């Protein structure tokens, strides 16, 4: 196992031991907070579920810091401005996973903030949620040059970070946005057109594949299919789309 992957696994194991011991918070010095801030660690919205569990931010922050310092893909390291780790509710029931950051995401350090991201936000709102209610991430944490498709070795290098996010967030449902996200998790070769709209399973978590918002910008007619997929997701979560969204189908 690569040294970085081993470090991530050991970090997660140590945090799980701390949680099992009954620790509910960790004192952090102002100097440590300053270092985390300068490292580009993005804020994560927490939801207190009243169970006394260790806050998810304390679990995710070390993994995010490792990703921020990662140099495993030299070409991506040379081109990136920011590592784009993830954003949202670290106790979310619903997690969206895309392909990789684009130019806007690389500049701002947050996933899905460009045109495709704005469309994703509208989809989330149509589902009766806000971005702060869900968790959003990509397979790759760094932007590929010219927004090219991620290389297999880049996906392999970055996948441990995504797996750690899934393990710590423990979503009830994952939406895979596009073929890259789906193939990274399920190791399948079928296209997204054939697989979308059907349930698959990843480590006992249901996965719904659907078209990437960037595809919808090029093919607006496919929005109807994506909305059908999102209604299926809501049903899996035991929810319904808001009445206004239903009327606009």
Role assignments for model-derived ranges:
Residues 1-15:
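Charged, compositionally biased N-terminal leader segments and the immediate start
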